[in-house]
C-alpha cells in the first residue's frame, strides 16, 4: 500500500517534464491522477498510458490553466470524475526570457498569467472542495530563480516569487481547516 492510496491528485502542466515526473511518482504511491495541459496530444496520451500502467485511475484534461472559467470547469469535471480532490500541484509554467529593456508587455503578461494566475485559478476552484473534505494539500512549483532572481528572466522570476508568497498566504488562510500549502523551489 502506497503513501497516497485512495487520494486524488491534480497536477497541472503534466503532459511532460517535471509535471509528468510528479504525476508518475504520486501514481507509484497509489494516487489517482487527474492532469491538465493546454492540449492532450501524443505526449499527454503517452503520459496517461504510463500512469495507467501503475494501476491507478488517470485522466488527462485539455485546459488553459490561465483562464479562470476554463479552470472552474475542469476542476468541477475532475471532482465529478474522481469524487474528491486531495492534492493540487500547481506546476503549469512557461518561460519567455528577455532583458527588461527588450521585454514586451505581452511577454510579461503571458508568463505571469500561465505561471502565477493559473495557480490562483486552481487554488480558487479547489479550495471549496478541500474545505468540505476538511483536508487537502496544495503544492506550488516555484524555482530558485524566484528566490535569487536571474538576469533575462524578470517575468519568470517574479512569477515564481509570487508562487512562494501565494503558498505562504494560503497556508495561513487554510491551515486551520486541515489544508496545507507549500512551495517547492527546484534549482540549478
Task: Give a label for each model feature.
Residues 2-34:
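Canonical Rossmann dinucleotide-binding motif of NAD(H)/NADP(H)-dependent dehydrogenases/reductases
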Residues 128, 172-176:
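Alpha-helical segment proximal to the catalytic Tyr-Lys
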Residues 41, 62-74, 105:
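The beta1-alpha1 cofactor-binding region of Rossmann-like NAD(H)/NADP(H)-dependent oxidoreductases
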Residues 143:
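Residue(s) in the substrate-gating loop at a strand-loop-helix junction
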Residues 99-100, 107-112:
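Substrate-binding pocket helix/loop in short-chain dehydrogenase/reductase
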Residues 123, 159, 167:
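Active-site helix of classical SDR
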Residues 31-46:
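Conserved glycine-rich Rossmann-like NAD(P)H-binding loop of the short-chain dehydrogenase/reductase
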Amino acid at each position: 500500500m502506497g503513501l497516497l492510496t485512495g487520494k486524488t491528485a491534480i497536477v497541472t502542466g503534466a503532459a511532460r517534464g517535471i509535471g509528468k515526473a510528479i504525476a508518475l511518482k504520486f501514481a507509484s504511491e497509489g494516487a489517482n491522477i487527474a492532469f491538465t495541459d493546454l492540449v492532450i496530444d501524443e505526449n499527454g496520451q503517452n503520459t496517461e498510458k504510463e500512469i495507467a500502467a501503475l494501476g491507478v485511475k488517470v485522466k488527462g484534461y485539455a485546459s488553459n490553466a490561465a483562464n479562470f472559467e476554463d479552470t472552474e470547469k475542469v476542476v468541477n469535471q475532475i471532482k465529478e470524475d474522481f469524487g474528491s480532490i486531495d492534492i493540487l500541484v500547481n506546476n503549469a509554467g512557461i518561460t519567455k526570457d528577455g532583458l527588461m529593456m527588450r521585454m514586451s508587455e505581452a511577454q510579461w503578461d503571458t508568463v505571469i498569467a500561465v505561471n502565477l494566475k493559473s495557480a490562483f485559478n486552481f487554488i480558487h476552484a479547489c479550495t471549496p472542495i478541500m474545505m468540505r473534505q476538511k483536508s487537502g494539500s496544495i503544492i506550488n512549483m516555484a524555482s530558485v530563480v524566484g528566490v535569487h532572481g536571474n538576469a533575462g528572466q524578470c517575468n519568470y522570476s517574479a512569477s515564481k516569487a509570487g508562487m512562494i508568497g501565494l503558498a505562504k498566504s494560503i497556508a495561513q488562510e487554510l491551515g486551520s481547516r486541515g489544508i496545507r500549502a507549500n512551495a517547492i523551489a527546484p534549482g540549478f
